[in-house]
Amino acid sequence: MANQKKLQVTLRRSVHGRLQKHRQCVRGLGLRRMHQTVLVDDTPENRGMIRKVSYMLEVQEA
């Protein structure tokens, strides 16, 4: 699986005051702080979490 596609995900908006499930999705993607960027595998599970909190994220293909 070394050739699996990756997504570069950056947290652009704060999780304060958001729904608990949305905060859990952000945490599940490995994001802790604003403006932090992580690389995640392009899987249906990660795509679902990204879609749920897309208003807080910036996503690019890596």
UniProtKB/Swiss-Prot annotation:
Q: Does the keyword Ribonucleoprotein apply?
A: yes
One Pfam entry name: Ribosomal_L30
Q: Which family does it belong to?
A: Belongs to the universal ribosomal protein uL30 family.
User: What is the protein name for this chain?
Assistant: Large ribosomal subunit protein uL30
Q: Which organism is it from?
A: Halorhodospira halophila (strain DSM 244 / SL1)
Q: Which SUPFAM superfamilies match?
A: Ribosomal protein L30p/L7e
Alphabetized HAMAP family for the sequence: Ribosomal_uL30_B (MF_01371_B)
Gene Ontology MF annotations: structural constituent of ribosome
Keyword Ribonucleoprotein carried by entry: yes
Instruction: State any GO CC term.
Output: cytosolic large ribosomal subunit
Q: How does it assemble?
A: Part of the 50S ribosomal subunit.
Biological process terms from the Gene Ontology for this record are:
translation
